[in-house]
């Protein structure tokens, strides 16, 4: 199993389901930071301003929001720099998708040296979000903070639960977009002024 989700799509009885964390299970006593995936904004029809989504996340109970797109921009820049190095093996394979990395590890280990040795955007976002929260709120310790990735991808949930390259993930929870969407849409409608 590489956590690709194909079995979920193919099961004629719809007996298989992706396992995400539930929003309700996130510890309310902790400082909760939402990490919306860049694709999250595409779920909202006629969204003119992403600030409605960002404010909505705060309104449903998150203490802060850190956009994964910020981390993706940094990873993109480091990837450009990495690609300029002389002794890299081609083809170069991005490490952002846990399904691709797991497939290579299990079935094509001879390609492992081609995977870019770089932290995926969700890991960098989780790390940066925690560091920024502790800088803003010096009373917080790392364990006082819950990093919650809002994801379209069931593989990311497995990836976070199983750790990043054998290490604990910087992300604590992975909540499905659909779980957050319905909570958020009601709050966003209230925030829109006629």
Q: What residue spans do the PLM features occupy?
A:
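Iron-sulfur-associated redox domains of electron-transfer enzymes in respiratory
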Residues: 19-194
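Iron-sulfur cluster-binding cysteine motifs and their immediate structural context
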Residues: 2-22
């Amino acid at each position: 199993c590489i956590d690709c989700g194909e079995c979920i799509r193919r099961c004629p009885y719809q007996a298989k389901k992706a396992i995400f964390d539930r929003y309700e299970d996130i510890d309310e006593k902790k400082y909760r930071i939402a990490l919306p995936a860049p694709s999250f904004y595409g779920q909202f029809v006629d969204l003119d301003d992403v600030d409605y989504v960002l404010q909505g996340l705060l309104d449903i109970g998150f203490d802060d929001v850190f956009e994964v797109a910020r981390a993706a921009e940094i990873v993109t820049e480091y990837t450009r720099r990495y690609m300029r190095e002389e002794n890299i093996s081609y083809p170069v394979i991005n490490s952002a998708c846990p399904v691709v990395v797991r497939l290579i590890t299990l079935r094509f280990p001879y390609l492992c040296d081609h995977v870019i040795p770089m932290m995926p955007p969700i890991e960098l976002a989780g790390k940066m979000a925690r560091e920024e929260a502790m800088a803003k709120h010096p009373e917080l310790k790392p364990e006082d903070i819950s990093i919650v990735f809002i994801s379209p991808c069931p593989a990311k949930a497995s990836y976070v639960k199983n750790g990043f390259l054998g290490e604990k993930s910087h992300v604590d929870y992975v909540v499905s977009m659909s779980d957050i969407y319905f909570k958020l849409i009601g709050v966003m409608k209230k925030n829109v002024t006629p």
